[in-house]
């Protein structure tokens, strides 16, 4: 297994659930729960990257390594680029970006995403899982990804892609049958050198329109390998209902 580290971007502001990074989950802040879950992977190191002193204090209180970054970042990826530089991580080292609102993320998925980066010899890797629910296909909060024959991303979108034209014309709520529909899983792997390059790339109009940071990579002509997970991962925390569900899971552990 190639060595990798996990970096977790964490900010306090959240439009749908303010302060969620520090939301209590069975006695510990969510960001700490995420870091502890990531530590179950094969990562050599797990570090939280944040711009808020309260998150820094919470991590330090629970023995989680943390690095402070600027509060001017518009994406988690550019925050991690700054964190990697501050930590003096070597250019060849693999970084897995684990979102700060994924306290139930599977450690195996973290490992596999790093492996996919190496196996495909690409600049960036991510993951997706098959989608079978029509409402999710139409839901803009469920990001979809379509792949080429080699398993690389063609496009990510909040729109329903691929669009089932004939079924929609007929007024049918049917999923496309010719190919699998994939929902994107928000986990990324890249080497530190490419992470720094990403931060230097110009912002693409597509990422602005869709509010999807990974579209910058496609816009600038770099392939993104996509691992198709065998099953859907546990959902992250975006709303109070999500938080209540996750709290219930930890209460049973």
Swiss-Prot record:
Keywords: Cytoplasm, Lipopolysaccharide biosynthesis, Nucleotidyltransferase, Transferase
E.C. number(s) listed in UniProt: 2.7.7.38
Catalytic activity: 3-deoxy-alpha-D-manno-oct-2-ulosonate + CTP = CMP-3-deoxy-beta-D-manno-octulosonate + diphosphate
GO BP terms: CMP-keto-3-deoxy-D-manno-octulosonic acid biosynthetic process; lipopolysaccharide biosynthetic process
Localisation: Cytoplasm
Stored Pfam families: CTP_transf_3 (PF02348)
Alphabetized SUPFAM superfamilies for the sequence: Nucleotide-diphospho-sugar transferases
Pathway as given in its UniProt record: Nucleotide-sugar biosynthesis; CMP-3-deoxy-D-manno-octulosonate biosynthesis; CMP-3-deoxy-D-manno-octulosonate from 3-deoxy-D-manno-octulosonate and CTP: step 1/1; Bacterial outer membrane biogenesis; lipopolysaccharide biosynthesis
Molecular function per GO: 3-deoxy-manno-octulosonate cytidylyltransferase activity
One Gene Ontology cellular component annotation held by this UniProt entry: cytosol
Top-level class of the enzyme under EC nomenclature: transferase
Domain of life the protein comes from: Bacteria
Entries under PANTHER family matching the protein: 3-DEOXY-MANNO-OCTULOSONATE CYTIDYLYLTRANSFERASE (PTHR42866), 3-DEOXY-MANNO-OCTULOSONATE CYTIDYLYLTRANSFERASE, MITOCHONDRIAL (PTHR42866:SF2)
Family statement drawn from the similarity comment of this UniProt entry: Belongs to the KdsB family.
HAMAP family documented for this protein: KdsB
Physiological role: Activates KDO (a required 8-carbon sugar) for incorporation into bacterial lipopolysaccharide in Gram-negative bacteria.
Protein name, entry field: 3-deoxy-manno-octulosonate cytidylyltransferase
Organism of origin: Neisseria gonorrhoeae (strain ATCC 700825 / FA 1090)
Designated gene of the protein: kdsB
